[in-house]
């Protein structure tokens, strides 16, 4: 099956690799795409694992998973990347995630901040 992150790759060749081993994620954009796919699959464990410990919403995990299951994920558009390459330790990715909730088309438009620590990328927060 095609990867839900809209990379045009197969899931097994894309976000499944990250979902299996987060250390395989090489860029901030790849982590952001893998997190989008984790929302599509309501993979709360990965969403928590890929969220930086300083901002990780552990107490909201059940609600996040419940919400992720309740919407129909339609599309991810990556708009802009700043740094976040394999050689970097920080970066930002601006994106739009389009989904349908209660019959209405909705959109999350965010510029996300990422940090790489000990070779592993993490989502920190929205700027």
Identify the role of each PLM range.
Residues 1, 89, 119-120:
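Beta-strand-connecting loop/turn residues
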Residues 22-23, 55-58, 120-126:
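Short amphipathic alpha-helical segments with coiled-coil-like heptad repeat character
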Residues 49-78:
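Short solvent-exposed beta->alpha transition segments
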Residues 24, 29-57:
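Internal alpha/beta loop-helix hairpins
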Residues 67-107:
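Surface-exposed, charged secondary-structure patches
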Residues 1-34:
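Short, low-complexity N-terminal intrinsically disordered segments enriched in polar/charged residues
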Residues 106-127:
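Short beta-strand edge/turn micro-motifs at domain boundaries
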């Amino acid at each position: 099956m095609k990867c839900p992150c809209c990379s045009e790759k197969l899931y097994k060749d894309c976000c499944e690799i990250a979902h299996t081993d987060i250390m395989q994620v090489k860029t901030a954009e790849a982590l952001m795409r893998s997190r989008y796919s984790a929302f599509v699959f309501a993979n709360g464990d990965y969403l928590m694992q890929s969220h930086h410990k300083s901002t990780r919403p552990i107490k909201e995990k059940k609600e996040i998973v419940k919400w992720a299951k309740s919407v129909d994920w339609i599309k991810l558009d990556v708009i802009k990347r700043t740094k976040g390459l394999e050689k970097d330790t920080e970066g930002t990715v601006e994106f739009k995630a389009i989904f349908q909730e209660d019959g209405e088309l909705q959109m999350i438009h965010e510029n996300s901040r990422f940090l790489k620590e000990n070779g592993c990328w993490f989502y920190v927060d929205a700027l």
